[in-house]
């Protein structure tokens, strides 16, 4: 009995302790589970927030990309002034020409479109090697710029007049009609209205020369020399001095070209004019030397053969004179000087 009682007591003592230990373990496990659940919820919440932020970022990026493309397409559309000015800054005259054409289809009297179309047409014209294409572009340039003048801002008018004057100047060089008077009109207006461009006096000088006004031409060329000197300008002045009989002044410019110019074509042109001056002065030996030197450098110079013909004519040797003029016509069938001389002596 004692043993049993002792065992029972031991069992009774051990049981509560065991139950207490179990309870503590359960509480610990519950706490751990709750802690794990809390951590899981926090992680889930963080992940959810991250996903939401990422989704918002993706949506924002796509919206930005869409808006950017829309804006870019708008800015660079064929009828956009922004695109027009950007192409102009890049000297892309063909693109400016096309864009302004599209703009004029929608708004035929848009001053901006007319101005840019006129300007781009002009620059395309002067870059052409085909005369017929050049004429077409110049016609467009003139028409657009004249229309633009009617509605242009006051500050833009002198520039339009300057460009219009240049367009008429080039029309005068590529067509059989005379436009030098209109070139002078608009270049003079641009100058009087305060537009500054170093080439205005030279263009005016060439226009006066085309109209047969050598003194006015010399005046403009002299003004041009003060702004910028060039070999082409020097020979243009020399030619005008020759036309008014001031051969001494002409020779000074021609000597400079022969001595200093690196442009072989201008040097040959200067030698030809010197040969003509020497012929007029009856300095036949120097004249012949100039013409023969030209032919050594360019055996196909019709002008040199013509000059030799005139030299022989003045010496009274008409057989040689006719021979030289015929040589000139073989090289250039429409050489006006040779045709005139042979026609004169055929009578």
List PLM regions with ranges.
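Alpha-helical adaptor scaffolds
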Residues: 166, 236-248, 252-296
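Register position in tetratricopeptide repeats
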Residues: 123, 170, 210, 243-244, ...
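Residue-level recognition of tetratricopeptide repeat
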Residues: 85, 119, 123-126, 166, ...
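N-terminal leader/linker segments that initiate helical-solenoid repeat arrays
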Residues: 20-148, 152-159
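Helix-start (N-cap) detector for alpha-helical repeat units in TPR-like alpha-solenoids
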Residues: 76-77, 111-112, 155-158, 197-199, ...
């Amino acid at each position: 009995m004692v043993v049993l009682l002792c065992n029972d007591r031991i069992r009774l003592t051990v049981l509560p302790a065991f139950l207490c230990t179990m309870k503590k373990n359960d509480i610990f496990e519950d706490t751990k589970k709750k802690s794990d659940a809390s951590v899981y919820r926090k992680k889930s919440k963080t992940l959810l927030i991250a996903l939401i932020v990422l989704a918002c970022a993706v949506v924002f990026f796509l919206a930005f990309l869409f808006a950017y493309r829309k804006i870019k397409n708008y800015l660079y559309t064929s009828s956009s002034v922004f695109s027009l000015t950007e192409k102009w800054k890049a000297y892309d005259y063909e693109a400016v020409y096309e864009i302004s054409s599209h703009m004029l289809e929608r708004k035929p009297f848009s001053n901006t479109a007319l101005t840019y179309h006129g300007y781009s047409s002009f620059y395309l014209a002067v870059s052409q090697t085909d005369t017929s294409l050049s004429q077409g572009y110049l016609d467009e340039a003139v028409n657009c710029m004249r229309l633009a003048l009617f509605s242009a801002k006051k500050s833009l008018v002198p520039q339009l007049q300057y460009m219009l004057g240049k367009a008429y100047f080039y029309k005068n060089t590529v067509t059989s009609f005379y436009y030098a008077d209109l070139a002078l009109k608009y270049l003079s207006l641009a100058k009087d209205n305060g537009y500054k461009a170093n080439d205005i006096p030279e263009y005016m000088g060439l226009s006066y020369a085309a109209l047969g006004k050598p003194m006015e031409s010399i005046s403009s060329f002299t003004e041009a020399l003060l702004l910028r000197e060039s070999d082409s300008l020097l020979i243009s002045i020399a030619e005008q001095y020759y036309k008014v009989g001031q051969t001494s002044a002409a020779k000074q410019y021609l000597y400079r070209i022969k001595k200093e110019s690196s442009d072989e074509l201008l040097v040959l042109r200067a030698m030809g004019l010197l040969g003509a001056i020497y012929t007029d002065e009856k300095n036949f030996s120097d004249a012949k030397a100039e013409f023969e030197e030209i032919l050594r450098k360019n055996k196909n110079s019709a002008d040199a053969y013509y000059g030799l013909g005139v030299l022989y004519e003045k010496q009274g040797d008409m057989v040689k004179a006719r021979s030289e003029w015929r040589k000139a016509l073989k090289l250039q069938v429409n050489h006006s000087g040779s045709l005139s001389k042979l026609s004169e002596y055929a009578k």
